[in-house]
Amino acid sequence: MRIGIIGGGAAGMAAALAASEYKNAQIVLMERQARLGKKLSATGNGRCNLSNLHAAQGGYHGDEPGFHEYALSQYPPAETLEWFRDLGLYTVTEASGKVYPYSDQANSVVDVLRFALDRPNIEVLTDFEVMKVRKDGDAFHVTAKDRTLVFDKLIIACGGLAGTKLGGTMAGYKLLRSFGHKCTKLRPTLVQVKTSWPGVSGLKGVRANCHAAIYHNAKLHRESVGEIQFTEFGLSGPVIYEISRDACQGSGEWECRLDFLPDLRASELMRPLMMKRNSNLNAEDLFTGILHNQIGRAHV
């Protein structure tokens, strides 16, 4: 049985390894770019957060709430880590439940998958851009610029439009539409937030833990606690990724509020501030010892 897989990212490589276990299966993995796993190499700021041991129902959002339950029940995080361990990848789990390669390098994950593909019944084709796919009876005809390959089974794992600089295109959507599948409206998710506050560029690169809340028309919409990072045009970081998807889905006024001292009551904070106010300190130094220096100065 010949199995074709379009897309050499994380899903495509994993699919090729799984399919290769079938008796008499011959696998052809087709990738448009010059190398496999280009997006995977960049994920997690180059560290690759490949799972989360605390994955649960409350951590997922979308129009199909049952999908993640099915996926996690079929292949829970513990089994994912065991699968990677069998491939030779050692991992470390942070207190948050996030799992990273022990090397702390996303390229380690890519290399482990790439080395595992070196099997007699797996052929990898890079620089292979699929132009068209058609079904003729029980066979799938996959056409590239210079040739057509025929398969008994076909897996489309092209990935999405995210990360256009890393190769994200509409190609996968077009192939799926050619088979009659419908695509929902595309929206950004896991993205940074652009803000209108003029002082944000001065905090570029600063990281801090805080309570972040997003408001829609002055009403609390979603909140989370964790690390944020300031950019030259706004906010980034895990917490922002978690709440930003909502701001892309509706009109009206959206506001992001940050509390850098969520565990302190206002009364607890006022005493040291009043003491400093009565000293010879400059106003910009009032928050020294309480907040990151640059954040403190931006508040004054």
Residue ranges and their predicted role:
Residues 4, 20-45:
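Glycine-rich FAD pyrophosphate-binding loop
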Residues 34-36, 41-42, 50-57, 182-185, ...:
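An anion/pyrophosphate-binding glycine-rich loop and adjacent beta-alpha core
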Residues 4-6, 30, 130, 149-165, ...:
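Short hydrophobic core segments
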